Design a protein with these regions (language model features):
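Catalytic phosphate/nucleotide-handling subdomain of diverse soluble enzymes
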Residues: 65-126
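Glycine-rich beta-alpha junction loops
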Residues: 12, 16, 39, 61, ...
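Active-site/ligand-binding loops adjacent to catalytic centers
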Residues: 1-53, 99-126
Length: 126
């Protein structure tokens, strides 16, 4: 008998940066950008309408960053190849899309106090 307990978190199952991505970032091959939740779902819905694939919320962040980069090129007239990774479909995340389309999904940012509290708790684990 095999049992599987899914994490409580929706979407991402690993809230961190992988080793390869971290090294590419450190070596200057890529840059990290901040994409808010609503912008990412805007991009995901646009992608779904254009491509017929409902992207996973994780992929929506990459799609939003790609759209930003394409818009920069459009404004400057620069031609470039822009590559992104569609990591998966969003079929198990339809509840999140429902919240977004219903207007119930909001951008959320941790306060400095929240961040400090979490860091303090991590320090207590050692």
């Amino acid at each position: 008998v095999q049992t599987c307990a899914l994490p409580i978190s929706g979407g991402l199952r690993y809230h961190g940066a992988g080793v390869i991505v971290s090294q590419l970032l450190k070596d200057g091959y890529m840059e990290a950008v901040d994409i808010k939740q609503l912008e990412s779902f805007d991009a995901g819905c646009l992608f779904a309408q254009a491509e017929g694939i409902i992207p996973a919320p994780e992929s929506c962040h990459a799609i939003a960053a790609t759209i930003r980069e394409a818009n920069k090129c459009k404004e400057t007239g620069e031609e470039k190849v822009i590559l992104f990774n569609l990591s998966g479909h969003g079929l198990i995340d339809m509840a999140s899309y429902d919240k977004y389309l219903s207007g119930d999904l909001v951008n959320y940012e941790l306060t400095d106090a929240d961040i400090q509290k979490n860091l303090d708790e991590i320090g207590n684990l050692a």
